[in-house]
UniProtKB/Swiss-Prot annotation:
InterPro entries noted in UniProt: Cell_wall_metabolism_enzyme (IPR050570), Csd3_N2 (IPR045834), Dup_hybrid_motif (IPR011055), LysM_dom (IPR018392), LysM_dom_sf (IPR036779), OapA_N (IPR013731), Peptidase_M23 (IPR016047)
UniProt topology in membrane: Single-pass membrane protein
Cofactor binding note of this UniProt entry: Zinc, although calcium also allows some activity.
Organism of derivation: Escherichia coli (strain K12)
GO molecular function, one term: endopeptidase activity
Protein's name according to its UniProt entry: Murein DD-endopeptidase MepM
Lineage, opening ranks: Bacteria, Pseudomonadati, Pseudomonadota, Gammaproteobacteria, Enterobacterales
Cited function: A murein DD-endopeptidase with specificity for D-Ala-meso-diaminopimelic acid (mDAP) cross-links. Its role is probably to cleave D-Ala-mDAP cross-links to allow insertion of new glycans and thus cell wall expansion. Functionally redundant with MepM and MepH. Partially suppresses an mepS disruption mutant.
Transmembrane spans: 21-40
Listed EC numbers: 3.4.24.-
Major subcellular site: membrane
């Protein structure tokens, strides 16, 4: 055997070097194949299943990434100071309103409020005309406590309103109502004696009409700071049927405070502008930071814990970012909350006008105080990891009329004005409305 081995070694050494390399490689490959034991699938084989017990923190580590523990129920809304104006803006509990504007579709409108895409598809199936919404039309809808759509109302025109109610089969049934009344313009005027709400009601405005006035003027006027003796004139178009008021629409408002006049005139697109056709809304930033950061947890009002099955809504968006990143106010407004609050950690809330509120949570340091006025882009805090948090991030929320919406898709205010033929038509309309807004 030794002689055979020496003969093989001698023959191997006498080979040219390239041949020796090739032969060696083939030898190694042959040995590898010889010791390899492949897994053979047998169709009828009984699988072996092992159950592994995990601790709760280990379970969480296997779940999709989230910046806040998903196995804990979210606390109730952090307290935001309320007043009687908020009651007028909020309207009926569970009812939300929206005026259709440029680029809107039924899907884009309802998606930002977290309404299920399946419901939107069912609505479109119930009435194909819902796919052709027009600028200035109004939608309103009712949700259950779990965020499920129960009813949608579409004001097609002053004369026609369509209602879509959920059926037992989880579809929607459409009914149409035609209004037969006569529309009449009414001027209601008065002087502020105490609160604006009480003064407006004394002048003959309904709660819904007071709400419409507050929304139209929200970017120009802080109604809480009106003084005794300030004057207002409101032009309403009201539908009368058999001597009763059926519905109304705000056409124009004039408010005089400390000797200065403020106007809001309705245009055909359903929005309000000043006498010159300039938009009243103050524009918002889309993101609360100077640069964009990775989203670690999305908006989901019906987020379900995959382990417990419990609904734990996530009412905002989480941005993963280094601690100490400057956090910016997305729009002009007033700081209404700046404090430390259990789950939210260091927390800031800003009110923009009367309809919009933004919230910023898990901060490391707060740079503003309650009552402070801020401008779009102002630094209000530094991001952190305080409160109930699994890592450094900013939790950011947008609320419209006390309803949380998706910050990434919500239709935010923009600074804009009318141009071209739209502006010419508006100026002609304003020329008729403004003279009617008299105080005498």
């Amino acid at each position: 055997m030794q002689q055979i081995a020496r003969s093989v070694a001698l023959a191997f050494n006498n080979l040219p070097r390239p041949h020796r390399v090739m032969l060696g490689s083939l030898t190694v490959l042959t040995l590898a194949v010889a010791v390899w034991r492949p897994y053979v699938y047998h169709r009828d084989a009984t699988p072996i299943v092992k159950t592994i017990e995990l601790e709760q923190n280990e379970i969480r580590s296997l779940l999709p990434e989230a910046s806040e523990p998903i196995d804990q129920a979210a606390q109730e809304d952090e307290a935001i100071p309320q007043d009687e104006l908020d009651d007028k803006i909020a309207g009926e509990a569970g009812v939300h309103e929206y005026v259709v504007s440029t680029g809107d579709t039924l899907s884009s409108i309802l998606n930002q409020y977290g309404i299920d895409m399946g419901d939107i598809t069912q609505l479109a199936a119930a009435d194909k005309e819902l796919r052709n919404l027009k600028i200035g039309q109004q939608l309103s809808w009712t949700l259950t406590a779990d965020g499920e759509l129960q009813r949608l109302t579409w004001e097609v025109s002053r004369r026609e309103t369509r209602t879509y109610d959920r059926t037992a089969a989880n579809g929607f049934k459409m009914t149409s109502e035609m209004q037969q009344g006569e529309w009449v313009n009414n001027l209601l005027k008065g002087t502020v004696g105490g609160s604006f709400v009480a003064s407006a009601r004394n002048a003959g405005l309904t709660s819904a009409e007071v709400s419409a006035v507050i929304k139209a003027m929200q970017w120009q006027m802080d109604f809480r700071k009106l003084k005794k003796g300030d004057e207002f004139a409101v032009l309403m178009s009201r539908e009368m049927l058999d001597g009763k008021r059926e519905q109304s629409q705000l056409l124009g408002v004039r408010l005089r405070s400390e000797g200065k006049d403020y106007y809001a005139i309705r245009a055909e697109d359903g929005k309000f502008y000043d006498r010159n056709g300039t938009g009243l809304a103050k524009g918002f930033l889309r993101f609360p930071t100077a640069k964009q950061f990775r989203i670690s947890s999305n908006f989901n009002p019906r987020r379900t814990n995959p382990v417990t099955g419990r609904v734990a809504p996530h009412r905002g968006v989480d941005f993963a970012m280094p601690q100490g990143t400057p956090v910016l106010s997305v729009g002009d407004g007033e700081v209404v909350v700046a404090k430390r609050s259990g789950a939210a950690g260091y927390y800031v809330a800003i009110r923009h006008g009367r309809s919009y509120t933004t919230r910023y949570m898990h901060l490391r340091k707060i740079l503003v105080k309650p009552g402070q006025k801020v401008k779009r882009g102002d630094r209000i805090a530094l991001s952190g990891n305080t409160g109930r948090s699994t890592g450094p991030h900013l939790h950011y929320e947008v609320w419209i009329n006390q309803q949380a919406v998706n910050p990434l898709t919500a239709k935010l205010p923009r600074t804009e004005g009318l141009t071209g033929s739209d502006r010419r038509e508006f100026l002609a309309q304003a020329k008729e409305i403004v003279p009617q807004l008299r105080f005498d």
